[in-house]
């Protein structure tokens, strides 16, 4: 394969559905989605087997590192209200118990399997705070854990038995028992097992505070040495008890028609509320009690503080923030609860240099520009940082290299953060451009999500180096140290993404020749992976295609206002907004579907006094939807459920019990009209089930029938009704069928049947002429849709389902289809059209020779008119436009139409027509259907000449691009060809090909690695680079097989090697290399030659790649050595002869640091 043009044409004939690029969080999202579905089914039927299977899958994926099991458990709490109350037959506790006590999945490292989940907590905390806790043990808790699991299992079993879903005898082949109604005796058994489980948990819970104490100690309390471990375990036990209470209440109320002890249930509800309050207070006070003192100007203090807060937040506070939603009284059991958490957690400071944390730290707030100094706020206190309401898209780090006075300086000195609506550039200053030894540049663009950032550094008399790495070791700038003095240890945080990176400088230096203020370190702030700045309601259930029943809570921190202050509230999962008297908070909310909502607010007041609030909603058309004041009594004056926060008692109150919000942008205004400060936690939107009945039209007048008959006939070009009229659109056909359906069955039954048959024929003809496949997004369509795009049913402006492109918050939002060249005719004009019910920031692109159509459509929200028998459509009640807008004559028309001309056919590259619709801004969305691309007419001579000029221009650019790609690929192609015999990529590699030849091959990054329109999908050049990578993978496999040394390239760490002294893997230029730290460090391996034939001589070649000092290799009964003493990576080869079947390989440092990239021992059988 010697010519890149052999490869090149293949990428033009790509599928219409380019592969979607994976996100770092996709495995978690998919696992949680499957669990959610399994829980929904289990909650409705009580049938356990499918749920157990998905729990097993979740556990397995956590064991291989694909997902974080603790994060999955934490996220599962949100499922507690998922099953509608009328359908639920089992409570959520029956699922949650198996999360906490994964007895199905084997045993932990302790003898008691019930401790397995808590061992996971210990391991995760160790990772988060980089401590060992070597003396900590769970031994004193084992009996308590066993008792809790036993009692909860009894409760589980009694619930299952009550609904006829208990264990069944054998020989019942393929039978799934049907859930039944419990008897009174069964419900009494469930109540008693609930009491037993509650008592067992509450007896054990105090001992979670300090498991190191004897079980006879009746007053255990948290200890500063172990609180990082014990508070998360206490939180887990408390969560079990709260969910047990919630589940029992839910179960008892579900079957209240059988037996219902109202006084006991009411008392249990009170107990649940009190426990939420008590447990929350315990978590809050404990967190504050042991929180380290922060000195923002000292790196060691900053790191100690950050480790404590992030561990407590991720393992305890985040969970405690969900506890109020377990209150059956205030949170409905028939909605999915989704609460945004805007709290920030911070990484350790990485850099400016590593090896000593007791240095000054100048934290630079890159979000706060100023006109002095380096241009941003310096000496910042991270405790004052808040969620900035922006979403990080990508980042770049700047690095510079300077050789000054025999000292090599190479490090990062700036960064660029790219957000959806702005770019922040910081640093990159004080560069001496006149110094020819000064080199500087930005590193590669790193796209979000980004999970971690680290710095590795080396400081000596002649070297001042650091390298910056992200996402587990990907180098992004700087120089890799030859011998590391230290490296930061920031790990990826479970289900968290980086949103801001703050720069850090230090006036201290590790060595007198090192730079200070120019060298930057970094500290990252992390937020939940699914948090976005936008507030979106009106989600669609993809199964029912109807609005989902959701409770969405948006922190007030996501709003804005003049001079608003933010105050810390760790228990809320967000900072609270402090509104002084008559201050106003504003928040934008995007509603995707018109429906009714209950709107609530969670707040506290100064001194827990009464609250006075003015609540105002401005709808999409600028009209007031509600504009009124509310007075709420103080917490003490009524029996209100509250949780104590740092600034008062947080309570819920209803702002409006039921209000219909139209689809589109809503502006929410909340004003404090009291003299006392108001602390806003969040605003909640609860979607309400629809109670309205669709109005139907019923035509009984002969005049109506005559009008509709005429409209049906006008769909066709002739009385034969075999061809559509040229001007008839697909949407017009749908409008006519709505009128036909409105004819009375009783009066016009025969005529209606005949007319419907004709309209069906018209629809089929419309589909046949449409070169798009699935213009109505019906089954079998060939659209490439973004992952959140969904079909919606029952919209009055559409016949059948339509496509909703949601706001592109977490993921892009688009619909795309490519028309194959074989479907097109030469020298022909095509019409592109469709109907939009509503859109904001909808981008429409039609491309053949280069984006012939590129438009932005904003179609206002308008309601449907009643179906009429005349020719007017049912769009729309006048709002911003009149009904005439539907005919395409108005600038904001619901119906769009464009033309695109096709010249000569380009079948060799399958040029085709590309048609895409996407949402351009995060708060946009669109409702679309009836999309068409149909043949219009042949081109005129003048039009043919015009399109020929376009073709020539396109062809020239195409050929130039092909030549540039071929030039870019040729060096890599030559390298890969050299690896293989006869340049056959499917054949055998040359005997001389080794790891070094492989590592020298760099697959180039081509310009179209990503799709030009569909963000997040592969582009056409990926096909080329994949073929290169596959050839390299095949070569690697063959080289690996011929190497007698096991794991000679260190791809599997130190597996198969015997290690002595300080030998460890490190990253050098993004590759793993072995570092022998001192002369007492070595690795060795013994190899036995298979099928060795006596004294037959075998020639072996040994290839090493290393840096600095010396190497010695030992062969059994005979010593052979290879010596290395260079300051750069060097490869050496040597041939040895021996007659035995056993070889000992020994790699030894003879001085200081010795770096090894790979070791090879290859048989060469002499003829």
From Swiss-Prot:
InterPro entries listed in its UniProt record: Cry_V, Galactose-bd-like_sf, Pest_crys_dom-III, Pest_crys_dom_I, Pest_crys_N_sf
UniProt entry keywords in alphabetical sequence: Sporulation, Toxin, Virulence
GO BP term, example: symbiont-mediated killing of host cell
Keyword Nucleotide-binding: no
UniProt-recorded Gene Ontology molecular function terms: toxin activity
Pfam family, one: Cry1Ac_D5
Family from the record: Belongs to the delta endotoxin family.
Additional free-text comment from the UniProt record: Toxic segment of the protein is located in the N-terminus.
Function: Endotoxin with nematicidal activity.
Protein name: Pesticidal crystal protein Cry21Aa
Native organism: Bacillus thuringiensis
